[in-house]
């Protein structure tokens, strides 16, 4: 009670809304505007309003560019005194904000808040596209680029763009021709110390990134991140055409070719094109005329061991690929993939003429012939 009397005497002007006390009537009047929503101080440049004149004055510096608060150490200027105080900690090394969990200290309150999420596990920034949540807004911004494909960091030398500034910096070393980091094992040189460290793992066999789920270890973070999606089921790469999602960007790129019909891999021997490099590699063996794999049943020869294994199932009747939905079995994985579309109703093959969609590429080809016949008759 005694302490309450002291407070009442020191702050005689009380707010009837929240009970907060002030030393003078002017301060109370100013405070009450926060409750009634009154904002009498308006910026003549952009129309934004404020409850206090001091807030308006600070805001106007955005338009005028005025920076009246200057650092005595380095001369850097700021529009707000609070920003100068924060900046000065760079020179003084002062870190007044301490973590209660691990006692680590920080120069900014916002840095402490970000750090505390390591202990609490709080992830307040969810992705609107896939629901994945992040502890920092910067991490969410970077993640968004997976969905948008945005690459805001452009190389001024060659025009190549990147989703992260660190990737651009690493790339720019290619143009500088300065390769000061050399591997002692094989004498190979690198532009960046990080590139050398990654390379050295090929010699040492070091795999510092270990999966908590299965214990598998990796030498590089990208491979580790991709692997973790096996356990989490995360598929951040979604096809804009049909909505199908993938855990790797390379798999999405390959899939999109089913819609676009793009076949960038060309056989130099016969001109045949393919949507995947692996398909071209297999095809090239046709021209080499080497068929080292022979069937023991019928003596038929094959270019590839996988082709022989598939063929042998015609003799054994083996059907190792089973549908989880209905239990039907197939001798080929491609046949199972086609069959599954009966259950999923997926129709990945779209006609560019009329927009009709089909389960199988053969159905699309048959359909497209109807357009060709109509065009021929029209001529």
UniProtKB/Swiss-Prot annotation:
<feature type="zinc finger region" description="C2H2-type 8">
    <location>
        <begin position="209"/>
        <end position="231"/>
    </location>
</feature>
<dbReference type="GO" id="GO:0000978">
    <property type="term" value="F:RNA polymerase II cis-regulatory region sequence-specific DNA binding"/>
</dbReference>
<keyword id="KW-0539">Nucleus</keyword>
<dbReference type="InterPro" id="IPR050758">
    <property type="entry name" value="Znf_C2H2-type"/>
</dbReference>
<feature type="zinc finger region" description="C2H2-type 6">
    <location>
        <begin position="153"/>
        <end position="175"/>
    </location>
</feature>
<comment type="similarity">
    <text>Belongs to the krueppel C2H2-type zinc-finger protein family.</text>
</comment>
<comment type="function">
    <text>May be involved in transcriptional regulation.</text>
</comment>
<feature type="zinc finger region" description="C2H2-type 3">
    <location>
        <begin position="69"/>
        <end position="91"/>
    </location>
</feature>
<feature type="zinc finger region" description="C2H2-type 9">
    <location>
        <begin position="237"/>
        <end position="259"/>
    </location>
</feature>
<dbReference type="GO" id="GO:0000981">
    <property type="term" value="F:DNA-binding transcription factor activity, RNA polymerase II-specific"/>
</dbReference>
<dbReference type="InterPro" id="IPR013087">
    <property type="entry name" value="Znf_C2H2_type"/>
</dbReference>
<feature type="zinc finger region" description="C2H2-type 12">
    <location>
        <begin position="321"/>
        <end position="343"/>
    </location>
</feature>
<feature type="zinc finger region" description="C2H2-type 7">
    <location>
        <begin position="181"/>
        <end position="203"/>
    </location>
</feature>
<keyword id="KW-0677">Repeat</keyword>
<keyword id="KW-0805">Transcription regulation</keyword>
<dbReference type="InterPro" id="IPR036236">
    <property type="entry name" value="Znf_C2H2_sf"/>
</dbReference>
<feature type="zinc finger region" description="C2H2-type 11">
    <location>
        <begin position="293"/>
        <end position="315"/>
    </location>
</feature>
<dbReference type="GO" id="GO:0006357">
    <property type="term" value="P:regulation of transcription by RNA polymerase II"/>
</dbReference>
<dbReference type="Pfam" id="PF00096">
    <property type="entry name" value="zf-C2H2"/>
</dbReference>
<dbReference type="GO" id="GO:0005634">
    <property type="term" value="C:nucleus"/>
</dbReference>
<feature type="zinc finger region" description="C2H2-type 2">
    <location>
        <begin position="41"/>
        <end position="63"/>
    </location>
</feature>
<keyword id="KW-0863">Zinc-finger</keyword>
<keyword id="KW-0804">Transcription</keyword>
<keyword id="KW-0479">Metal-binding</keyword>
<keyword id="KW-0238">DNA-binding</keyword>
<feature type="zinc finger region" description="C2H2-type 10">
    <location>
        <begin position="265"/>
        <end position="287"/>
    </location>
</feature>
<dbReference type="Pfam" id="PF13912">
    <property type="entry name" value="zf-C2H2_6"/>
</dbReference>
<dbReference type="GO" id="GO:0008270">
    <property type="term" value="F:zinc ion binding"/>
</dbReference>
<keyword id="KW-0862">Zinc</keyword>
<feature type="zinc finger region" description="C2H2-type 1">
    <location>
        <begin position="13"/>
        <end position="35"/>
    </location>
</feature>
<feature type="zinc finger region" description="C2H2-type 13">
    <location>
        <begin position="349"/>
        <end position="371"/>
    </location>
</feature>
<feature type="zinc finger region" description="C2H2-type 5">
    <location>
        <begin position="125"/>
        <end position="147"/>
    </location>
</feature>
<feature type="zinc finger region" description="C2H2-type 4">
    <location>
        <begin position="97"/>
        <end position="119"/>
    </location>
</feature>
<protein>
    <recommendedName>
        <fullName>Zinc finger protein 883</fullName>
    </recommendedName>
</protein>
<dbReference type="Pfam" id="PF13465">
    <property type="entry name" value="zf-H2C2_2"/>
</dbReference>
């Amino acid at each position: 009670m005694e302490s309450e009397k002291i407070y009442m005497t020191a702050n005689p002007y009380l707010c009837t809304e929240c009970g907060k006390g002030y030393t003078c009537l002017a301060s109370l009047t100013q405070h009450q505007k926060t409750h009634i929503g009154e904002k009498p101080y308006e910026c003549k440049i952009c129309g934004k309003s404020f409850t206090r004149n001091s807030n308006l004055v600070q805001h106007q510096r955005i338009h005028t560019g005025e920076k009246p608060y200057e650092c005595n150490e380095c001369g850097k200027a700021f529009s707000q005194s609070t920003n100068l105080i924060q900046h000065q900690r760079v020179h003084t090394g002062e870190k007044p904000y301490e973590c209660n969990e691990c006692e680590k200290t920080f120069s900014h309150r916002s840095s402490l808040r970000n750090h505390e999420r390591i202990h609490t596990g709080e992830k307040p920034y969810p992705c609107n596209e896939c629901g994945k949540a992040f502890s920092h807004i910067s991490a969410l911004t970077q993640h968004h680029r997976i969905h948008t494909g945005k690459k805001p960091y452009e190389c001024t030398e060659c025009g190549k763009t990147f989703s992260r500034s660190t990737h651009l910096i690493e790339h720019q070393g290619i143009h500088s021709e300065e390769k000061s980091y050399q591997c002692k094992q094989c004498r190979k040189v690198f532009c960046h110390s990080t590139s050398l460290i990654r390379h050295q793992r090929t010699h040492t066999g070091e795999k510092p990134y270990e999966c908590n789920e299965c214990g598998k270890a990796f030498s590089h973070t990208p491979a580790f991140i991709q692997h973790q999606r096996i356990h989490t089921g995360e598929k951040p790469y979604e096809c804009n055409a049909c909505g199908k999602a993938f855990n790797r960007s390379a798999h999405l790129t390959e899939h999109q070719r089913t819609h676009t019909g793009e076949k960038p891999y060309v056989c130099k021997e016969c001109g045949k094109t393919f949507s995947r490099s692996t398909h071209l590699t297999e095809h090239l063996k046709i021209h080499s005329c080497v068929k080292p794999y022979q069937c023991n049943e019928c003596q038929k020869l094959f270019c590839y061991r996988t082709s022989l294994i598939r063929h042998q199932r015609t003799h054994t009747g083996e059907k190792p690929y089973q549908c989880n939905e209905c239990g039907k079995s197939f001798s080929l994985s491609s046949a199972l993939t086609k069959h599954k579309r009966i259950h999923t109703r997926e129709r990945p093959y779209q006609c560019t003429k009329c927009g009709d969609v089909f389960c199988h590429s053969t159905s699309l080809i048959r359909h497209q012939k109807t357009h060709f016949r109509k065009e021929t008759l029209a001529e």
